[in-house]
């Protein structure tokens, strides 16, 4: 059409239906716009109709609002609603007033990890309805003064909020270039203008295929500069406010200062509201762009983490949700996590737990879960008092799972296990265990309980009342290996709790069978092996439940998995403390089977240590001592292992050989000879390999060396050796090895090797001061953690 053919444009607006907004407190007015181009004679030449809608938000609507007055005001101010529809508007407002915000179930279903879109704000809410055909007019407004630029950007934003318009806007390079230029040049002039333009680009950022456009105009870098500037401005506002508050506090009678402070405070509140709208939309845009890790790295290099952690000091829930969501995304990379550590993030997050806002609390807990993989941050969480706060959340169904995961990570550290005893955590966990209706307990719950049961104080709380009885009943009913692992941890602690297991020895022994699931059998065996109770008649247990054939059968190389075989060896070590049991086992031919296993597993220190511990137990008893010394090659193996690089193995060997030497003179000579040879090996090698000349033979004083080497039997010089127990020298000095260093294990102070004894005698007449059970592979193997891990969330 030629320009002269059209004289003017006729626009007609026709009102339509009115309805309530599905989620907000707002009315939706449907209307139709009809545009007609008239010719020179006034006749219509071209016409177009478009259906539109206007949203009237009713922020002030609450339970006490006068509906009649509000309806009248809405009809008066909105020209799209005919006065005849006043009663209809009133009914809709009444419905909105009484409508519940959302159903709890629905809200839970719709909950997303992504924050909500920024709401409408002052500057974008204008009465004018934008039209995609009027884009040229809106672009022209961007070249005018600030108020016109704000208006033009608001109209373009109105269009951009409708995803259907984005493709068309993308083709309008003039508009996008003008918006980017105005933002770059004028963002300091008007917060509303900056917010509008960033919001327009945010609409594009919601779709990954538009990210190239935002990168092209360098909007991301500009947003980071704006955020940094606004955060610094906020600090200046706070400083100014703080100075005026201090002046008022120092001169309470001065009303002028009070009025000045009140005025400044109101101004500050208004500025903060606008600033937080800007921060929210800018950060959301960056969060969308950060889905590309290369872009995220650029943000990290521009200190995005520091900016976000600073923003945690705000009180605006919606802004905080966005900030914490961003931090959660960033926290999966170590560099970002380290930046958060520098900014003391845990101290800032602790104030949000608990909080009234459900979404904020949920996302904060998820950020803490990510951070809790770091040992130092777990330590910080305990220091700032998060333990009782997280424990309190276990009772809330919405947060129970995520809070438990964080607590589980904290429970991995031995230092913190005992602290759980001073919260109400354990009673809550026990309640959850017994209320769990599924055949298998939640992995997170049982893993957490397994860790806590490694501490003696916690175990006392677990066993209170019928705690152990209920656990045993459930574990045996469901054949649950993880629940039995928890029971096994309970059984390892000396004291009253160990004696509670006397009632369940039969139940546990009945599970030791090849017909049961191997994992479950391992845990039952491990629990029985922990029951070093003097009054327990192990011979009766072995005979009644026919355990000896099972134990012997599993010792054959390749007969079972290594984990099960190791538990069998440990079990044999426990029952061998009993004289009659040791004899029973010796008669069954278990000792040769152990030696064969020792040959097969000689590279595995754990196996070696536990097998020689069985020998150590057996040499205490006359019946088994003779078998070991006279009928097997066990002493020879022990001599070979005397100088093993593993300290634990050396210790058990030395003590076992000392007992053998005490009862057998022939072996005593061999043992002493080997000890002497090893102790003096370097010196002897030097002497035998060199011919000392005249100048060297007096290096060692006046005493001649020859008598020690050539004259007489070397074994006739007992002053050169340790005595039979290997600890006391001929001068009566005590070897330093006699003393154990103490350390912290599972939150309890224990001996260096987890088996300190007193110098008294045990129930079988054995001196406890020499040796106790070596640390077992259960929970302490170097190749696997003692706690149960679960999948990352």
Swiss-Prot record:
Q: Give the species.
A: Mus musculus (Mouse)
Q: Which residues carry this modification: Phosphoserine?
A: 60
What's the PTM story here? Phosphorylated on tyrosine residues by SRC in vitro; this reduces the binding affinity of the protein for RAP1GDS1.
Stated role:
Involved in tethering the chromosomes to the spindle pole and in chromosome movement. Binds to the tail domain of the KIF3A/KIF3B heterodimer to form a heterotrimeric KIF3 complex and may regulate the membrane binding of this complex.
Q: How does it assemble?
A: Interacts with SMC3 subunit of the cohesin complex. Heterotrimer of KIFAP3, KIF3A and KIF3B. Interacts with RAP1GDS1/SMG GDS.
The protein's name in its UniProt record: Kinesin-associated protein 3
SMART domains according to UniProt: ARM, KAP
Q: Can you provide one Gene Ontology molecular function annotated for this UniProt record?
A: intraciliary transport particle B binding
Q: Where is this region: Disordered?
A: 103-123
Composition bias type Basic and acidic residues, residue spans: 103-119
Cite a single GO BP annotation: cardiac muscle cell apoptotic process
- Note the segments forming the ARM repeats: 333-373, 374-412, 494-533, 578-620, 621-662
Q: What GO terms fall under cellular component here? A: axoneme; centrosome; ciliary basal body; condensed nuclear chromosome; cytosol; dendrite cytoplasm; endoplasmic reticulum; glutamatergic synapse
Recorded hits in InterPro entries, A to Z, give: ARM-like, ARM-type_fold, Armadillo, KAP3
> Is the keyword Ribonucleoprotein assigned to this protein?
no
The record's keywords, sorted A to Z, are: Phosphoprotein, Repeat
